[in-house]
Amino acid sequence: NIVENALEQVRPIVAKSYRDYRNYKQDFVRMLDDVYKKSQAIMYVGDKENSNADSALVSTKRSLIFNQLNKELYQKFFLTTEEIQACRDGYIYIHDMSARRDTMNCCLFDVAHVLSGGFEMGNIWYNEPKTLDVAFDVIGDIVLSAASQQYGGFTVPSVDLILEPYAEKSYRRALAKYERLGVAADLAEKEALADVKKEFEQGFQGWEYKFNTVASSRGDYPFITVTAGTGTGQFARMASVAMLEVRRGGQGKTGHKKPVLFPKIVFLYDENLHGPGKPLEDVFEAGVACS
């Protein structure tokens, strides 16, 4: 290179700056070329690196192309030369490299606090749910929206305890309806409880459909987990058992039903609650049957 040699003889410092700038531009050309090649593969072949992302969807294709650019930028500006070489040689692997630049990884989301008193999301004010079925719908909206702002797992802890107060509201509403209709007290209570149980079953079924068919704005299906099993109240127990029974029954055509992927269910076992003769032994048995 004539210019580089001339600068080296006159001003070595300037020559070094010239080389660095030239290499910088060449690196960007290579980086964008790699992104373009990957984008062509995504558009016409697809990408199966992440089973949560269906590359047949247009929104997912866009997300995957953006992720490839993010990955290249992360390698360029956040990794050392030694780290990059170690990745290429297979000595280390950096998971979710495409998402590490601009957000957080994994979340234990406090849905109960968000619901309490209402909240704002997407410039719209959500009032606190007054019934169980509305609580299921609102929680589904919250989870998909919040999970889109991060990567990795998204966990909603103790859904049995979260849903318990809304089940109580639905129960009192149903009970009041039957009492207005002149139904006997014992029958009214029985029918109100049956209504709440049905709302639980439909709500958990709705989550299973929503979390496995509605992609997040990231273009993937968020890795959603829920925990349950420790609530000792009547409706908390009903929530845990209903969720496990819905999962056990599966989704799909009659005679061909199978369990869905999301949400993952984590049963919180406590020997003092779930052991033989303990108050939640029946909930534990439902968990065993589901597993």
Summary of predicted features, one role per range:
Residues 1-32:
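Non-catalytic terminal accessory/regulatory regions of metabolic enzymes
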Residues 20, 24-291:
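Conserved catalytic cores of very large enzyme subunits
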